[in-house]
């Protein structure tokens, strides 16, 4: 692939790591953010120490606060901003962009109030004449590992296979490999909903439960993620892939996962307010829990783990009581769909 110019919107941990991947592949990378101190740090010291204390970025990675300058003549735009501001940033892009570009996103969540997937938001806010079919970049990927060029394999999903293949070639190299998929609904819902299960898995660890319990929540969590995804139109096969069970394993078992760490702290008795204050990063699983719970209620999808975590986070239910309720639910067959 010849050199491309890519705007990365969001200088967080994942946006920074993906910027390095693109730079390693010889592309021109422009990071956009709205914190002048952070942008100045990236340009002056080639660091982003809030997320990576010991990493020095290539000096060819340039950061901007001016969106128009960032988007000038770009071939592709990658959204890596928190879910709650995706619509706002998309509106700003639509007002600024003056040519057609490949539009990608690598965020994982559902819009809190509308319960919409992020590709839907981008489709609504960015006119068709300015964009491709949206490409979702998702899968088992800790930024802390990708930034040091550890092996990472994820998925590029788009309704248009050719566009997904463009993104596959854009990112793939000797340590970072993408597979294509056309099941956008499946890939997006898997990436969003696994954060909820990761909070639950972390809570079990914080409470002192062992590996048996952690394996159970991942397996049963995958089952309810799949139920909701299929109700929305996804293929159940997607959930057995990288963006499904792969992402759930890496997020639901690792200290690198902020959602897992948040759950662990909840299990140890910390308040949600203290957890969010101490984390210093967005915990997508918190807001996604409410969106997924409300969506499941609307569609009549059985999601007992999500419901339990929702009750703990939003109604103050004791975690041990929530676990007790799940363990005393009506008996079911493992492959029962409801």
Curated annotation (Swiss-Prot):
GO biological process: carbohydrate metabolic process; glycerol-3-phosphate biosynthetic process; glycerol-3-phosphate catabolic process; glycerophospholipid metabolic process; phospholipid biosynthetic process
This protein's record includes keyword Cell membrane: no
Keyword Heme attributed: no
Protein origin, superkingdom: Bacteria
Pathway(s) of this molecule: Membrane lipid metabolism; glycerophospholipid metabolism
PROSITE patterns: NAD_G3PDH
Residue numbers annotated as active site: 194
Keywords noted in UniProt: Cytoplasm, Lipid biosynthesis, Lipid metabolism, NAD, NADP, Nucleotide-binding, Oxidoreductase, Phospholipid biosynthesis, Phospholipid metabolism
Amino-acid positions noted as binding sn-glycerol 3-phosphate in the UniProt annotation, renumbered to this chain: 108, 139, 141, 194, 247, 257-259
Function according to Swiss-Prot or TrEMBL: Catalyzes the reduction of the glycolytic intermediate dihydroxyacetone phosphate (DHAP) to sn-glycerol 3-phosphate (G3P), the key precursor for phospholipid synthesis.
Similarity annotation: Belongs to the NAD-dependent glycerol-3-phosphate dehydrogenase family.
Protein name in UniProt: Glycerol-3-phosphate dehydrogenase [NAD(P)+]
Species this protein is from: Streptococcus pneumoniae (strain P1031)
């Amino acid at each position: 692939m010849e050199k491309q110019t890519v705007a990365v919107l969001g200088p967080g941990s994942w946006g920074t790591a993906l910027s390095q991947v693109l730079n390693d592949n010889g592309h021109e990378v422009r990071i956009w953010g709205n914190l002048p101190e952070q942008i100045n740090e990236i340009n002056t010291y080639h660091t982003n120490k809030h997320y990576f204390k010991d990493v020095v970025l290539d000096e060819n990675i340039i950061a901007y606060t001016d969106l128009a300058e960032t988007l000038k003549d770009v071939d592709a735009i990658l959204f890596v901003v928190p879910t709650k501001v995706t619509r706002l940033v998309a509106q700003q892009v639509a007002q600024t962009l003056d040519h057609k570009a490949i539009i990608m996103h690598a965020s994982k969540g559902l819009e809190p109030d509308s319960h919409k997937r992020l590709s839907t938001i981008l489709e609504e806010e960015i006119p068709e004449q300015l964009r491709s079919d949206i490409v979702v970049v998702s899968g088992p990927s800790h930024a802390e590992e990708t930034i040091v060029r550890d092996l990472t394999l994820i998925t590029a999903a788009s309704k248009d296979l050719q566009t997904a293949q463009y993104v596959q070639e854009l990112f793939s190299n000797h340590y970072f490999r993408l597979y294509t998929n056309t099941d956008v609904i499946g890939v997006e819902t898997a990436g969003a909903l696994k954060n909820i299960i990761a909070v639950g898995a972390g809570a079990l660890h914080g409470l002192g439960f062992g590996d048996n319990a952690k394996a159970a929540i991942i397996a049963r969590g995958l089952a309810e993620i799949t139920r909701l995804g299929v109700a929305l139109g996804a293929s159940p096969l997607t959930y057995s892939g990288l963006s499904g069970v792969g992402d759930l394993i890496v997020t639901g078992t690792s200290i690198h996962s902020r959602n897992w760490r948040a759950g662990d702290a909840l299990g140890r008795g910390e308040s949600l307010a203290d957890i969010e204050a101490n984390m210093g990063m967005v915990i997508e699983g918190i807001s996604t829990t409410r969106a997924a719970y409300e969506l499941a209620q609307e569609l009549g999808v059985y999601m007992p783990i999500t419901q339990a975590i929702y009750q703990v986070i939003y109604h103050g239910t004791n975690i041990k009581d929530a676990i007790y309720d799940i363990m005393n639910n009506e008996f079911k067959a493992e492959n029962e769909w409801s």
